């Protein structure tokens, strides 16, 4: 049986995707003829009756790896989510939403261009209000825009792919409260030009990262958001690219 399927079958992981995360991070081992070994990949065939165990279940704390990233970023910034009204831009399966709720957020509103991706545990949570099929770049006339007052969210978070963060910053700035915090994931591969990206979607040269930082800082400041910090994600991405967070607030001193 495949290693990821075996983990689910044994009740050691809730889903195959969760099992794959555990395997990818080296948190699974199985007892083979030569002793304990790590599965090389999720699809590795293992004996159905073999002894297998999870050595570190940190990957399962949240519905996706994104939760680990945001949880670490909020700790880095010292942003307290207790009782906060939050907006999650690019909600997807809800890793960021899960992290906010586990840190005490009172409510999380989500925006995502996709549909049917939010984890069932979050979709059924009364504290979560998802708006699916909505591009955060243009929310005018949407149910979200009609229901949520502008400048009403204490914390805005974002995790976006295949679009530059700068395209959704106007929406973020419009709905962020005057004393709020924006903690946004920056993925350089979506901020650079095609010539900067190599095989497998990886950024070719580390020298491109300062250009991305300047682009994000300039875009924030043009919208009245002052950057408090710009830092490498404490938890690495899964595709080999470096990721960063920008922490910005209205009317604060630049860092």
Where are these regions (language model features)?
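S-adenosyl-L-methionine
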Residues: 109-167
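Residues at the N-terminus of the alpha-helix immediately C-terminal to the conserved SAM/SAH-binding loop
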Residues: 92-97, 114
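Core SAM-dependent methyltransferase catalytic element
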Residues: 234-255
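Short, glycine-/aromatic-enriched active-site segment of Class I SAM-dependent methyltransferases
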Residues: 188-205
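S4-like RNA-binding module at protein N-termini
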Residues: 17-72, 76-79
């Amino acid at each position: 049986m495949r290693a990821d399927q075996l983990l689910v079958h044994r009740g050691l992981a809730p889903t195959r995707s969760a099992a794959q995360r555990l395997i990818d991070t080296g948190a699974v081992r199985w007892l083979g003829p030569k002793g304990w070994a790590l599965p090389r990949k999720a699809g590795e065939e293992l004996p159905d009756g073999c002894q297998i165990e999870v050595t570190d279940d940190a990957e399962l704390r949240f519905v996706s790896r994104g939760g680990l990233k945001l949880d670490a970023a909020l700790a880095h910034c010292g942003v307290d989510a207790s009782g906060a009204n939050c907006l999650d831009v690019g909600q997807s399966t809800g890793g960021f939403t899960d992290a906010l709720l586990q840190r005490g957020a009172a409510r999380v509103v989500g925006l995502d261009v996709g549909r049917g991706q939010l984890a069932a545990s979050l979709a059924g949570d009364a504290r979560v209000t998802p708006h699916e099929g909505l591009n955060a770049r243009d929310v005018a006339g949407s149910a979200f825009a009609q229901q949520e007052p502008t400048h009403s969210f204490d914390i805005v978070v974002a995790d976006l792919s295949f679009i530059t963060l700068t395209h959704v910053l106007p929406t973020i700035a419009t709905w962020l409260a005057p004393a709020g915090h924006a903690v946004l994931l920056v993925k350089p591969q979506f901020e650079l030009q095609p010539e900067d990206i190599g095989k497998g979607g990886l950024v070719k040269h580390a020298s491109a990262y300062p250009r991305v930082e300047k682009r994000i800082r300039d875009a924030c400041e043009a919208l009245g958001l002052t950057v408090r910090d710009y830092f490498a994600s404490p938890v690495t991405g899964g595709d080999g690219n470096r990721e960063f967070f920008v922490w910005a607030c209205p009317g604060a001193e630049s860092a």
